Design a protein with these regions (language model features):
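Positively charged n-region of N-terminal signal peptides that target proteins for export
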Residues: 1-4
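Hydrophobic helical h-region of N-terminal Sec-dependent signal peptides
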Residues: 9-14
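Sec-dependent signal peptide cleavage junction
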Residues: 15-27
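Beta-rich interaction/scaffold domains
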Residues: 24-91
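Extended amphipathic ligand-handling, pore-lining, and cofactor/metal-binding catalytic surfaces
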Residues: 26-29, 81-319, 324-386
């Protein structure tokens, strides 16, 4: 309640600052700081009864600023890009938060992204594919990142359920059979947290099944590969080649070109999955493919180590592409951004390579990947009847 009162007070003060003739004069920076404080208040990974009002108040306050004041918005997390960055048309998305679900639901759970175009192409793309494959089931959406949910809600007025909200919606609508399909890559921390939430609601349904994440079981070490990893490896390689003039990876290698697929990385034991994907690429004969991660977990996937590996292998041209379901902030900024710590910049600044190109596309927009999610959903459904 204190945060809500503070936000409403900031909004009231701001409207007085910029909205009424004869109001006490304040600096542009003070007006911007008031909005930054409101943005920081909703940049949190927890939802409260105050969240909806805080999101609405932050947007109203932002809209009341002049263009010059908007450029001055800076906080612990706040920046002009929070409301000002154009990431595409949110109206093309479907939050899939409607009631009238029926008795059979597929809940597609994603981390989420505030990039509208990517959300439509990648997350909605997967959801649409699953809905088309199972027309007798209702597909609904949940995001695990409340920070992203709040961002999209405040900026675009799009309301997306978090996992607990989505599960409660299913209960309230009388769902009897529930299949949960995570779009996460692996059995990592996000998957573990999802399982905790699902288990807390499990006794509310007649039957519940949780499908495999994209890359399937983790395995014990870097040598463990499986059909899911092979399918994803083939899919991303095919998609990457399609955006070049090369017909095959062998052609690219002969021309001195390497492909670096950048994942997120994790300190979770599941980080071995990235090492397994490198093993999978090598097993398929894609020796000019290198797996990296933003977080540098596992260690060999850190940017500087990947640069060293690509250089040692003798490649002079590099294509960077995200190994992520969504091409959101990490793809646009950590990978392809112009900042000094982006992967593109670090590869260029190494002075080793003749060219560094970026492909910004998520796994979710690749048809073969969508089909793999459909297969995982079907496998989970099959367990309901056993």
């Amino acid at each position: 309640m204190k945060k809500l009162i503070a936000s409403l007070c900031a909004l009231s003060m701001l409207l007085c600052m910029v909205g009424f003739d004869g109001a006490e004069s304040v600096s542009d920076q003070e007006a911007a700081d008031a909005v930054a404080e409101m943005i920081d208040a909703i940049y949190v990974q927890s939802r409260t009864e105050e969240t909806d009002a805080q999101c609405a108040a932050a947007k109203e306050a932002w809209d009341a600023l002049t263009d010059a004041q908007k450029e001055l918005v800076e906080g612990e997390e706040a920046s002009p890009d929070y409301f000002g960055l154009d990431t595409g048309d949110a109206s093309l998305d479907d939050p899939r938060n409607a009631d009238d679900i029926g008795e059979k639901e597929i809940l597609v759970v994603s981390f989420g992204t505030s990039y509208n175009d990517s959300r439509v192409a990648d997350i909605k793309g997967i959801e649409d594919a699953i809905q088309a494959a199972f027309p007798d089931w209702s597909v609904r959406r949940a995001f695990t990142a409340q920070i992203i949910i709040n961002h999209v809600q405040a900026r675009d007025g799009e309301f997306i359920d978090n996992v607990d909200q989505a599960l409660q919606r299913a209960v309230d609508n009388g769902v009897k059979q529930l299949v949960v399909q995570p779009t996460h890559l692996m059995h990592g921390a996000e998957y573990d947290e999802l399982m905790e939430s699902v288990n807390a609601f499990a006794d509310k349904f007649e039957a519940v099944a949780v499908a495999e994440p994209l890359l399937g079981e983790v395995g014990n070490d870097a040598t463990v590969i499986n059909e899911d990893k092979a399918a994803v490896a083939e899919a991303i390689v095919s998609a990457a080649l399609a955006e070049t003039d090369y017909a095959t990876m062998e052609d690219a290698a002969n021309d001195g070109t390497a492909f670096v697929f950048m994942g997120h990385g994790t300190a979770h034991v599941a980080k071995v999955t990235y090492s397994q994907m490198q093993t999978q690429m090598n097993t398929l004969g894609y020796n000019n493919v290198f797996i990296g991660t933003v977080e540098g977990e596992p260690e060999e996937t850190a940017c500087e180590n990947v640069i060293e590996a690509v250089s040692a292998a003798g490649y002079k041209n590099v294509v960077l592409r995200p190994l992520m379901v969504v091409a959101g902030d990490h793809a646009n900024n950590d990978m392809a951004g112009d900042e000094e710590d982006s992967w593109k910049t670090m590869f260029l600044d190494s002075g080793v390579f003749d060219s560094v190109d970026c492909q910004i596309a998520g796994l979710g927009s690749i048809k073969a990947v969508e089909n793999l999610y459909v297969a995982h959903t079907q496998a989970a459904m099959d367990t309901l009847s056993k």
